[in-house]
Amino acid sequence: SLLVTSGPPDSSLQVWQVSAEDSDVIKSVSAISTENGTGQPWAKIAATSSRAPWVLHGSRLNNVQITEVESKKNVYVSGSRSSEELSAVAFLDCNTLLVCCSKGQLCLADTRQPQGPLEAAPGPAGGQRWCMGVGHGPPNSQPVARLSSGGQLALTDLRKVSEPVACARCSVSSPGSSAEFLAVSWAPALEGCIAVSGFDGTVHVYETRSWDGSGREAEPLFVHKGHAFGGLDAGEGPPVVTAHTWHLQKPRTLLSAASDGSLHIWDWVPPRGS
């Protein structure tokens, strides 16, 4: 198996080989160059193997590309002239990609147009930074959730990306904090459930099916506080959750990591009567 990562030591993507089951060795095998200039954010990445091992990557709208991992050949290059910074990229299927700008705009593109347009639809107002999570579903009807650094959540129907179908506000302790680790994700096996992290040392689980367009504060079904009780970073205050993901086979199991190096695997229980 191959893994692709983005990050140090430079702007390139690193390709890793995962050894067979009887070994725990992961070795670097190659690198994929990107168009990220010095000082630009690391590329956001997403992968698909539905047609061939492809990686979607880019840090701004005008440098979004799809590269075939083994040959390193570009099969799609954005035709956008905009330098809007990206916060997330995703494959909806082998022919459709979705990107989210840090200001909250969503952009759809057809990978069958090698230099197709990738223009941002109007985004939310305000100076907040946003991230995106794409749920599971039939092509072009997957639910999309966006989370802002101010704690706002917007749910979007991809058939009309310019307007959210529902919105709410997270009950987080420190909205407006750094957006570096913001994350929102859909449960793969629980309809309407999302998880939110990146504000502090907690992960919140929400049920979204009752949300409307009012934007009122939503109460979480469950809050995982395990990281918040970990050791303090040296002179940097309490740990912050840096990433989380849902277990694919266990509906109520999540994995989360924090800035103190802790990694938790945990289950959540819905409130009684829910």
Residue ranges and their predicted role:
Residues S1-T156, A166-A189, A195-G215, E219-S274:
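WD40 beta-propeller repeat fold
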